[in-house]
């Protein structure tokens, strides 16, 4: 043949190309591979980008056990100093006495100290009932 296709054959070739193009989507289904390009052809082309969906870094395939190992635990000498520091900081914040900086911040923010018992204020209805 002269490499010239007749009209029906050319239409069939175009249809096959269209089917191949349509089967390759931007977001392939998990676990499916692009059958139009064999794996050997993908490895031969170094300029082609790596497909995340088919890589081992895909979240459907990756887990923490792959990175750290299944029985991995942080050593106590890395965890203990940080834990002790955070506990000491929280205790210090709770137990420290009020300083001048705290008073200054109250003035800046406009906070008014709350009275210990609201029923003794003259504006509350409970205070009016107690007087009558």
UniProtKB/Swiss-Prot annotation:
- Name the domain of life this protein comes from: Eukaryota
Q: Where are the transmembrane segments?
A: 79-95
GO annotations of cellular component type: mitochondrial inner membrane; mitochondrion
Its primary localisation, in coarse terms, equals mitochondrion
Task: Tell whether Transcription regulation is among the UniProt keywords.
Answer: no
Q: Which GO terms describe its biological process?
A: mitochondrial respiratory chain complex III assembly
Q: Mitochondrial matrix compartment: which residues?
A: 16-78
Mitochondrial intermembrane topological domain ranges are 96-132
Compartment(s) of residence: Mitochondrion inner membrane
Q: Which UniProt keywords apply?
A: Electron transport, Membrane, Mitochondrion, Mitochondrion inner membrane, Respiratory chain, Signal, Transmembrane, Transmembrane helix, Transport
InterPro entries xref list: UQCC4, UQCC4_vert
Q: Where is this region: Disordered?
A: 29-72, 110-132
Signal sequence, start to end: 1-15
Q: How does it sit in the membrane?
A: Single-pass membrane protein
The UniProt family comment states: Belongs to the UQCC4 family.
Subunit description: Forms a complex, named COMB/coordinator of mitochondrial CYTB biogenesis, composed of UQCC1, UQCC2, UQCC4, UQCC5 and UQCC6; stabilizes nascent cytochrome b/MT-CYB and promotes its membrane insertion. Forms a complex, named COMA, composed of UQCC1, UQCC2 and UQCC4; activates MT-CYB translation. Forms a complex, named COMC, composed of UQCC1, UQCC2; UQCC3 and UQCC4; mediates MT-CYB hemylation and association with the first nuclear-encoded complex III subunit UQCRQ. Complexes COMA and COMB are bound to the mitochondrion inner membrane by UQCC4.
What is this protein for, i.e. what is its function?
Answer: Required for the assembly and stability of the mitochondrial ubiquinol-cytochrome c reductase complex (complex III (CIII) or cytochrome b-c1 complex), a multisubunit transmembrane complex that is part of the mitochondrial electron transport chain (ETC) which drives oxidative phosphorylation.
Q: What protein am I looking at? A: Ubiquinol-cytochrome c reductase complex assembly factor 4
Species source reads: Homo sapiens
């Amino acid at each position: 043949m002269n490499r010239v296709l007749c009209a029906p054959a050319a239409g069939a070739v175009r249809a096959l190309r269209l089917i191949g193009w349509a089967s390759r989507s931007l977001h392939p289904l998990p676990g499916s591979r692009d059958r139009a390009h064999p794996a050997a052809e993908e490895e031969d082309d170094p300029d082609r980008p790596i497909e995340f969906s088919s890589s081992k870094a895909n979240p459907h395939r990756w887990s923490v056990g792959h990175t750290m190992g299944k029985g991995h635990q942080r050593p106590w000498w890395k965890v203990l100093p940080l834990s002790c520091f955070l506990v000491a900081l929280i205790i210090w914040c709770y137990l420290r006495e009020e300083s001048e900086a705290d008073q200054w911040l109250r003035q800046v923010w406009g906070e008014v100290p709350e009275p210990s018992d609201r029923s003794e204020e003259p504006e509350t209805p409970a205070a009016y009932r107690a007087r009558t």
